[in-house]
Amino acid sequence: MSTLSQQLSQLGGGSTVDRTWKLKQHSKSLIYEPQVAQDQDFSFIHAVGVEGLRDLVSLDSRFAQFENNLFSDTSIDVDRYVQTQEQNDLLDKAISAFLSLIGPYLMLSPAVKALEWLVRRFHVNQMNAEQLLLCVLPYYDQDIYLRVADVIIKLPPLFVFLNKSKSAAQNPPRNLLIRAFSADMRLFELITEYIVGQTTTKTSYQRQLSFWSQFAIYGLVADKADPERMLEIYLPALAKLVVTIDTDCQIAAYMVLTVLGNKMPLNKEVFNALVETIAANWTQKAIKSGILCITQMYQQKQEPEVLPTSVMTALNKAGFQPSDVVALSQKYKMALFTLGYCMALLRNPDAANFKGLEEIISNTQFGSNESTFLMRYIVDWALAKETNTSVAALAAPVIAKWVTRGETVPELDQLELKLQTVFTEAAVEEMEVEEIQEDVDVESLVEQAKKAASQTTTYFSTKTSENYAELSKIFVQLIERGYTMDKFVSMFSSDIASLTFFARIWASPSPLLARLAAVEAAKTIITAAGEADFQNLIPYTCIALSDASQRVRKAAASFAEVLKSKQNKKPIWGVEKIYTNDCSYLGSGDVTVLLNALSLEECILDESFVIRQVSDMISKKKGYKSAFSTAVLAYLGSHAVSQEIIAIRTSLLTLVTSSEEPIVPTTKVVEPLYINPPNDLAYITELIRTVTDKTGIKFLESLIKNDSPIYDEVCDIVTQRLVKLWPTLKGDAHLGLFRFFVDLSLDKDVPFDSLDVLAHVDVPTKVFISLLDDCKVEQNTTSMDAPSDESTKRRRRSSSSTVRNLLQGKLHHIAERNLRKVSLVLELLVASKTTDDALLGPLFTQLGEILTLGTDSNLPIDYCQSLLADVLLNIIRANQHDGASIDRDIRVDIVVSAIRTASNAQIQNKYLLLVAELATVAPTLVLHSVMPIFTFMGANTLRQDDDFSVHVIEQTVARIVPCLAGNTDKVDMLLVSFVTAFPHIPQHRRVKLFGELVRALDASGTKDALATLLFLFAQKSAELKTARKTSEVSAIAKFCDSLFKLFDASKQLAVVLPYVTLVQELYAIIATDPKTKEKEKKTRRQIFLQVDKELEVSPIDFLVVLLESRILPLQAGLVQSPEALKIAENVLTVLIESQYPELLNVILSLLPLPLFVTVAGRLGSSVYKTVLARFSSGSIEEEDTKASDTLLESLHSLLKSTTDTGDLVLLLQIVETVASGFPKCSDALLVTCAGEAVAQLKNSDDDVFIQAVSVLSSLCLRLGARMIGLFPATISSVLARDSSDNLIALSVLALFATFIKRLPSFMVSSLPKIFEFALKCPADTDTRKQLFVVCVETMDSRVVLQTLCDSWKFVEGFENARLFADTLDLAVAEADKKQIHSKADSLITLCLEAFDSSLKLEANTAARVQNLFIKCLIAIVLKLNDKTFRPLFVKIVDWNTPERSTLLFKIVCRLQENLKSIVTSYYGYIIDLALEILNKASAITPALQRNILSSLYSSFRFDREEFWNNEERFTKISDALGAQFPYLTKVAPENSKLLIKAVVALCELASEDQKKQLNDMMIKLLRQAPLYGSRCFAALFNNVGEEFLPFLPQLVPQIAELLESEDEKVESAVRAELIPAVEEVLGESLDRYLA
């Protein structure tokens, strides 16, 4: 037979699928959990949405439009499932507008609230899911997306790729979206259309556009992209976005267009249309992005195209300048746009455009093909017929930029002729742009030429420059017109005039064709000339052979062949005629060698070949004789000196300086040119290259000193030349030049950077030594004053007269200049990284000078001192292995003085590092000065808190401390210095610093450094404690603990004995009489700080505390290190005989168990018991069985013999610890110890009793059944103990719990006594409950249930009753059905006993107890079947008495509510009792009436068997209920609602006749109890409605009568409740029936 609970579970399955679906749909919420959302009504949700909308309106007034539709009050009643299609279309339109507008605010709480209303009321998550997703998709990586995705029941088809992330409640990864957008063009088209629509309605926003552009670009670069389909989607959308006035829209479109233009092929029409559309529509803020877009779109072109006029107009209007092109080109690849822009500039060829063009070409990095294309384009434009000469001339500077970079095009020669110029920057700058008259005839030009040519004898003079300019111009025009050169040659008065003219043409900037014609004309003249040596033309022939044009070089080679044919002829042509000065000449043999060496064929092929050949000649390479080289150099140099035309002289100097290596005679050859050279950079450059010796260097110095327009460029060239010359100079030259540059650097008026030269050359050590000697103060001051003996005195001597002198204006200036000079020399030393030890003496001398200067004046010497320290450090470190050879130059006393006088901490640190390095090189020298160093460190450096200072201290300690090996006094002084400085050392630096100090002392062989240091801190701590400086004492203790941690166990234990020795010495000194103390003061060690008075705190206590804080690590160290263990044994050997028991105990507590037992055996029992306290911590891990057994035997003996309660507690704690911490110890010994613990249960001391109970609990867990023999004595002793003390009660409860948990079967007989103890003891409820829980979970349920049934008599008070009820409830739940069936009668009896006991309590307490046991009763009943429970229910009914009736019906009501229709028929056992009570109105109480009515209401409500439809039963109960209405008015009006609910529930069960019977009864009651009767009728119409309409004719007259009632409450109830209820069912007003 099934249980009642199983029957109950089969009920209530009446919910339809439709209702479940609607509930699930209603529970979908963006804000609330489903279980909360399903209970919310639409009014509440609407209020939330309206609140959100109001906040949105405050942010954006456009939201106000939705107050009257989506969020109106009438929207609460809108149901889109019953609306017409037209109504739903309007609703969708409003929803679409709202979703379009809400996008930017989705991260705000008001937006979520407003959207909540649309989801809950209009189901946008179903009906508008696609648009909702489009709205929220830009937030795909935010929490709002997860919320929206969660409420969408089914994703639209295009968004099914989001299903996985939706199911996992995770944001979709970026890669998923990229793949989806790339693979499904329909999806991307949908999103693109949505974005375009947003821009049309001006509701787009930055995040949305960024999202779209980002994934649009990903779609473009995807491998699966279909170009045609992409263009079909992209171009219309982009065209719409570009023309909007929204900046963000435009920028998003530009981003996509940039990629589109480079990814997809666009035809010319589409491309131009896009570019022009961009330019025509960009907003002010989008201009920069638009321009960048256009530049990148042009990169997809195959070749450059001129920018359209409309685009250029838009660019100009936007303020786009050529400088902007340059700036962009440095960041982006945009060469094709730049070319198109440059080409477009030529459309309007004015000066401004060409200036911009020049700026672009000068500052933009073009590729070779691009550069050639643009150059050819500009040249073709300039050569075009429609381009006149004056306009074409504007392009000359632009073309010159290319030519100077070595670029050219074939058409350039024609342009040079057209413009009558050569394309070099210099020539173009001098060129006058004027219109050349094309209509001038040749005859006129010839006449002008004849006139000009006849006026000059040589054109190598500056006096002929004007004539040359006029004639060269005519010459070019005649060439352009094809005039015969023979005729032109005949115009000159002499061959000197003609040849110098033509040589000047080809040797200076001229058009190519002019240069070519000049060479050929000269060849014609030479060929026709008579016998002569034309060697004066050889230098100019070399210039022609180095021409950039191969045609010119070929002509020059032919000219040279003619010269060869004229060699060895007499006389020399042009002597004293072509120059105003005479020059050197070559012998005929040398001329032959020179001409043959030129290798003309190679010259034709390589323009630089002739330069290399001349270089070989003058540098004596390739076997040329010295005399020949010298002659050639003198020959070329003299021509350069004699030539007055600067441009030609520059070319000639190029030949002179052709050698890469400096040639000494060069300077002498061209020396005349060093006087007042013109400010021509090319000329000065070549002139500087001629410098090779002292004379030339003087020229370079003059260039540096004299300002000029090209000063900066000249200085750069001078620097390069000096760096190159430096290795070839001799010592004196080095020193002189070095002094010049140092003095120059001191001159603030000269901007030349001397250090730039000196930093790039290797300066000999001797030069530095000489310079340092120059820097001595006495050297500089004696030049003004007579020498005196005082100046020869040593560094540290100064006098008042010296100070006065230094403070005098002039001498002060000299001292300041001297200091700057020293600094400069030292900077160079640092830069050169010179490490020659020869510098040590001068440097230390200079350091002494600087210190004296700083002491005797107010000059700043910090920088100079710092540099000196750096140099000295470099030298000492480089020469560490040569200490014996350099220690004679070392002056440690000066270094110490520098440390003590320095005002800057960093400088002090550097010199401390220097001392540290010196300690390695010369330890003996350092030792004499070590204490002043450490005294200074203690007062200064240790207080610094920077990393460099810490490094300095560490290095100083590491290097200097080894010098102290064996010197105890100095070690003591060192340690005292550090301890004294301790308060000033930054806290986070202390531990590392002192650790390094100890390690350094240990490494140097100093013994007991750590012990001495701790001893000093102990004295310091005692002193501070006396002064009541608690925080400082704490700081020392914390520091010493941290310092101690740095060392291993061996080192820590090794501290003890030397520390104790020091303490003993201290106490011995303190005990000495004052006179002896005074005598021994000078010989006493400095570490004994406090010897004049007794110490309030013993240093031993300091060590004890320190060791106690390290017990666990030390114990581990002893186990791991045999060395540490040996040290511990030695320490114990000494301490056993000492007077320091505390220290002895600490050391003993560190020992491993075997050693501990061995050592302890040698001590007295009192010490043994004290030391045993360490085992009470429970943290020992030991597996030595023999040692643990020995310990247990000792403990057992002590437990027997000890009577002191404190010792007993301690021993019992140790037994407990051993039992839990030593798993391998003997169980038999533990049992003997347990017996002793049981014996101690009878001890009168509570602490001993409690500890004994605790020990027995622990031993029970360990031994289990082995303790069976001790159980009777244990239980009896424990229960016999007075349990009024809370601690005792708690310990006993814990013991019982352990016994029950470990040995449940042995505790059955003791369980009643345990329950009694638990219910009576004063322990807190939670602890006792834990015991009951253990019992229920561990022991047999029958035993527990029976024990509970027998234990109710021990329950007193509510807390115990609740504890008992909770235990019973738990026990019932733990038991199975069979066990409950077997104890059912006893359990019901137990509940009835509890109910009886509750009746004796105060009302509220009684109700609480009754509720607890009714709950237990129901739990019991649920595990019973009907056959078992029915007799028990009868037993409960039989238990009833008049006093118990209220409780009985309360029980019945709760049973009805929990068991529902299963127990409806059970009401038959109590119906008579209920009727009897209800019909005796005088005997019923309000509580009894309430419980009866509640039970009836529950029974009516769950009646599924027509139990109450029985005529007799129905009549009796309806009459009884009717009888209660008059009673309500008199006694219990508070039960009226319950009575009415019961009547309505009965009516819902009734048949037609029974309803009529009930109606008749209620009509009568309207007269007896009109108020409650009318309310009852109102409830009936509200619930059974139409079924009561047939009885309306009977009711209407009664209503009319009640409306006339004098009782206002009755009239009000009828109007407010009854009439509306009737009208609601009737469907019309009652007025016409009541009229």
From Swiss-Prot:
One Pfam entry name: U3snoRNP10
UniProt subcellular location: Nucleus, Nucleolus; Membrane
Keyword list, A-Z: Membrane, Nucleus, Ribonucleoprotein, Ribosome biogenesis, rRNA processing, Transmembrane, Transmembrane helix
Transmembrane segments: 1141-1161, 1288-1308
One Gene Ontology biological process: positive regulation of transcription by RNA polymerase I
Gene Ontology cellular-component annotations: 90S preribosome; membrane; small-subunit processome; t-UTP complex
SUPFAM superfamilies recorded: ARM repeat
Record flagged with keyword Repeat: no
Gene Ontology molecular-function annotations: snoRNA binding
Disordered, as annotated region: 781-803
Membrane topology summary: Multi-pass membrane protein
Domain of life: Eukaryota
Subunit structure: Component of the ribosomal small subunit (SSU) processome.
Family classification: Belongs to the HEATR1/UTP10 family.
Function: Involved in nucleolar processing of pre-18S ribosomal RNA. Involved in ribosome biosynthesis.
Record protein name field: U3 small nucleolar RNA-associated protein 10
